[in-house]
Each structure stands twice: as C-alpha cells, then as structure tokens.
C-alpha cells in the first residue's frame, strides 16, 4: 500500500490562542503531488493545549481527481488511537472529485501529536494533484448550563390545529460565539413548501456534556468544511430530548440535508450514531412532538405518502434520509432509528388526531364540579357523569392505565407526574386540558 505525503506547515497551538469562553477553530491547508507518492510524511499538530475543552471536532475536505478521492483512505492518529475519516453522509454533491468527511470527535485528553495519513489502495501509478484542508473546532466552554428552552409563540396557521411548536434552544444561544440570530448565516435564504419530513442522525458522538457545543460543531463543519450557507438541518434533538433551532431564516426555509434534493422537505437530526446505539425515549418523544406540530400545521398526512422531486420519486411523508437517496448512498438515520419510523408515523398521526385536532376546553377553577374536577388536580380526579377514556400528556403518551379507581366517581392519579394533560371522556367529542400538580 502506497503512502501519500501531505505537505503542510506543522501547526503548534499555543496557550495564547485558546480561550474557551469562545469557540476556536483552525483551517489547516493540505497539498499532495505525485512526487511524494512513495514517501511517508505525517503532519504533527501539537494539541496538549486543548486540555480544558469539552471535545475537539475535526473534519476533512479533499479535492482531486475522482480516482484519488475514491481510492484513498484518510486517517488521523492521536495518542496511538487511529481514527478513520468516513465520507460524510450529509454531503449532497455528486462530484466524485471531492471528499468531505463526517466529523470526528476527539476526547479532550492530552494529545502530544496528531498524525494525518493518506494511503492509496490502488498500486498503479497515476497522476496525483490534490489539495484540501483539515478543519479543527473547539467549542466554547460549558460551565454555564443551557438557557431554559424558550416557549415559542404559536405559529400554526390552522385555527383547528392545536399542536404547539415545542420549546427549543435558539440559534442565538448555541450559536452565540458565531453571533447567530434568526437570519440565515449567508444570505439569501431560500424557501419551500414542505410536504415531507426527513429524519436524520448526526452519525457523531453518542455522549457529551456539551450538546449545544456539538450543535455548534455541526454548524462549523457545514459552513466551513462543506461550504454551505448555514447548518443543513432545520431542527436538531439531543439525547436528553432538548430541541435546537437549526438553519436560520424561519419557518419553511430550505435546508441542506437530502442528497441534493432539498425542496419540499424539512430535516430534523437526532444527535448520535444510531448504527451503534438506539435513540433515547426522550429523543423519540420530542421528535413525535415536532413532527406532529409540522404535519398538522402543513396539513401533511403523517402516515401517508406522495410524490417528491427526489429519488425514488415517491416517499412516505415521514421518511429517513436514505429513503430519498440512490441505493447504498447512506444508511442515515441508522438502523436503530430507521426501524422505529413505521411506529413513529402511526404515533404522530394519533398525536394529531387526539391532541392537535380535537376540540379542546381548558379547565380552570370556575369549572369546579362540572364534568371534571378538581381543577387543578393533585392526587385525584373525578367525573360524575362519564368514564375517563384517555389521559394523555403533551407528548401524546397515554397515562390512562395509571388511573386507579378511588370510588365510584373518582380516580387516584397520585402516581402520575405533574404537568399538562389532555383528558377525554367516553362518549364525549370534547377534549379537556387539565393541569396536574
């Protein structure tokens, strides 16, 4: 196997360059040519000063002829551990002369030197003339916890649709060191009519104590490595079920996430690699809440399908990334998430029909001794005339099995967590919104 030499200045990062109250990033230029095909030369990057950061995110971009790009393997050695750069599942270009990698997340432990290597599996002599760069990103520190997710104003254009946009962490929070606001990072924004909701995974780290830093690292790679206008996804969800605002520009802004066919889609990315682990229940609950909001708002049938200007031309309205790409292009959103999409479609449909579209009455203290009481409820709930058929939280999770008969008219609900619930009575079309203390 031939080793390809990368020509670049050794980068030594000094303490004065690092201030973890703000993110830091470096673009390291790389060049290779035919004369160095049979010689070995690594790039050493002094990285001991990275200690104190939550993680180091590294991505790679190489441009050459298609034979070079397809036949080369790019690796990074750090502390005797070898990381292989995998072609980005997000890259939406068909140009085979460009290699863009997924992000590699390095632990923030002392790394005396990094060594970047490129090796060719093709032993034939061919002309080499390629260039590129290594992108290194360190997030701002996470000593201050995430700002509490904001409760957005209702943005539904349908008076009969009551699915709310979930609370979320805004761009100005996770993207504060980029000075992000609600606008797209590089204007102009493009807009589309959303008909299909596309689910992704980040294929990155599964653990972090700084998830908003992970979101920022994806933004940095999408803008500086991929060369996009902004982060590609419209929304992102971390393993704790926290929702993050993605691409700037507002509702129905066209993203960059769907194999080059981004029209008529919304992209939501669950943070993690779901070829390796399974998404958490908190992530899935938030995903359902978000999909229900958008499907209801746009009158999209959650369990339906229709034509789309993308491969294969006809897709489920809630689909995985790989459904809209040519065969074997990507495994995104990972097998452990993809296999849950059938049930996600049905659960989202039920969320819409039982919570979002049902006529709703908010119970308050003046409704005492009406159909449902007391208001607010605490340890018990009563209805003099009807059985309770459904007791559902705002995520669409059914709690009716937790209702225990207290007497003829009342139920013990002490085991149910506090929060907002939707209550339905047998034989009644109306849904009641009730707060349980």
Report the location of each language-model feature.
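Short, glycine-anchored, charge-dense loop/turn motifs used at functional sites
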Residues: 194, 241-242, 391-404, 421
